[in-house]
């Protein structure tokens, strides 16, 4: 009953566990991203990069600091020692950046602090383009991806983000005319200050509306380019001019920063990322269903899958499972050849499924997934899972040759060989367990390898000590004495 419950729980855990390519690991590498649009590289280096570097370089556990300056953006990566706690590293970097925020340019956006992880990888990549006969332009397709597709896919379980590649973004462009500005004595600072204020939402306190207290907000946005052209710009001398008098205001698209093409044709692409702990196969399955719904609801746009990173994961999973089955089959064949008794082989090889299946329950308990590392570990130890049972069954066979009944032989043989079986098992544990405590980046992967092997080996010990003697007592048959009075069977040519 115990092993039936463990096997049932293991099967349920196997079905409920997620399939991944490799385990999700988090490295103690923290990234600080700061943006100052329009700034020159030299300005970014002196006013942003060096100040952020100096702030984080003195933190405890820092190994290296890398900084990249590109097109108005500064990215600083702080690498800590592997022993550093990731939440502590994030808090330390965030506090250090907050401490120098007052020394950074006031017009820059607040820096963002994020941690590095192997979880956020692309699972699927799609392209979107107008269908034949559709009137949609690139701007409409881009808006469809940003608004409709992204919202629908982010509702799929396991989807972490949807990123558009290529396409265009709407932009209200203001092109200043220096001659008219000089004639009306308007500076670019006046225009910039007014544009910032017109796009700002701010709380306006509380007011009495209809006898009830209501929150009030100040909304100062414009909806169209025509509204923006009519915007009044106050000047220092008390005058005001309209923006359209000193600039050309147009509703257009921003300059593309990325391009997506398929078969030489420009399209709009989007990538689907998974979250930490989610499986590529589950995310791909849910994303495909969501895209199929979007395609059926919007026939005017054509959604095409171009990259499927979940398919190699499926192939690796199936290959690992086939390797596990082949290893188990060969182990059974070898045991049958040397035991030369199908009943003894059945008892010994029952340890294989009864050790592997409960291991999946242990994987779920530790939060491990079905990935290349854990399945490789099971395939590697599948041959040693029958060792304890073989030792037990061989000693039981020896007692049967003495003329004892199967029940008596099983009880006496199990008591006689118990310490040897336990010693063999813990010798194997001593071999595999240290891999779970390896240092460095490889140790983050081999942690699951070592614990998976140890769980399976300990499960095989449980089977050998509890189940194998019981099965032998009821399945094995007593040896019938031959005419010469011997109970041993002839060894044959293989054992000579």
What are these regions (language model features)?
Residues 317-325, 347-350, 378, 414, ...:
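Internal alpha-helical transmembrane segments of multi-pass membrane proteins, especially GPCRs
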């Amino acid at each position: 009953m115990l092993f039936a419950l463990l096997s049932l729980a293991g099967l349920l855990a196997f079905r409920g566990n997620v399939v991944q390519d490799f385990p999700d690991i988090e490295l103690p590498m923290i990234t600080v991203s700061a943006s100052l649009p329009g700034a020159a590289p030299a300005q970014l280096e002196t006013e942003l990069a060096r100040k952020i570097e100096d702030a984080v370089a003195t933190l405890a556990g820092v190994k290296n600091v890398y900084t990249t300056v590109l097109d108005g953006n500064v990215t600083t990566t702080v690498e800590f020692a592997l022993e550093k706690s990731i939440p502590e590293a994030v808090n330390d970097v965030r506090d250090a950046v907050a401490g120098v925020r007052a020394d950074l340019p006031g017009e820059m956006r607040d820096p963002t602090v994020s941690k590095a992880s192997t979880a956020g990888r692309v699972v699927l990549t799609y392209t979107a383009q107008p269908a034949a006969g559709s009137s949609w332009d690139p701007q409409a397709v881009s808006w469809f991806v940003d608004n409709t597709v992204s919202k629908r896919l982010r509702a799929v379980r396991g989807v972490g983000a949807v990123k558009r590649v290529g396409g265009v973004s709407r932009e209200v462009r203001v092109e200043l005319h220096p001659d008219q500005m000089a004639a009306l004595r308007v500076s670019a600072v006046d225009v910039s200050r007014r544009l910032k204020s017109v796009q700002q939402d701010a709380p306006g306190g509380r007011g009495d509306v209809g006898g009830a207290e209501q929150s009030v907000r100040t909304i100062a946005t414009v909806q169209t380019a025509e509204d923006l052209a009519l915007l009044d710009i106050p000047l220092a001398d008390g005058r005001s001019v309209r923006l359209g008098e000193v600039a050309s205001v147009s509703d257009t698209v921003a300059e593309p920063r990325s391009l997506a093409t398929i078969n030489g044709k420009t399209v709009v692409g989007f990538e689907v990322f998974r979250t930490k702990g989610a499986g590529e196969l589950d995310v791909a399955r849910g994303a495909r269903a969501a895209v199929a719904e979007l395609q059926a609801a919007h026939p005017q746009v054509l959604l095409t899958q171009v990259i499927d990173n979940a398919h190699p994961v499926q192939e690796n999973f199936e290959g690992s499972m086939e390797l596990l089955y082949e290893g188990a089959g060969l182990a059974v064949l070898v045991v049958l050849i040397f035991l030369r008794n199908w009943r003894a082989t059945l008892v010994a090889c029952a340890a294989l499924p009864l050790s592997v299946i409960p291991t999946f329950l242990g994987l779920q308990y530790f939060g491990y997934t079905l990935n290349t590392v854990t399945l490789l570990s099971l395939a590697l130890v599948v041959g040693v899972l029958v060792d304890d049972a073989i030792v037990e069954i061989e000693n039981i066979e020896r007692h049967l040759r003495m003329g004892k009944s199967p029940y008596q032989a099983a009880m006496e043989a199990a008591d006689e060989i118990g310490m040897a079986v336990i010693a063999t098992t813990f010798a194997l544990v001593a071999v595999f367990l240290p891999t779970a405590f390896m240092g460095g980046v490889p140790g983050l992967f081999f942690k699951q390898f070592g614990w998976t092997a140890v769980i399976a080996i300990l499960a095989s010990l449980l089977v050998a000590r509890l189940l194998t003697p019981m099965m032998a007592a009821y399945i094995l048959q007593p040896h019938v004495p031959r005419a010469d009075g011997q109970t041993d069977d002839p060894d044959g040519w293989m054992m000579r």
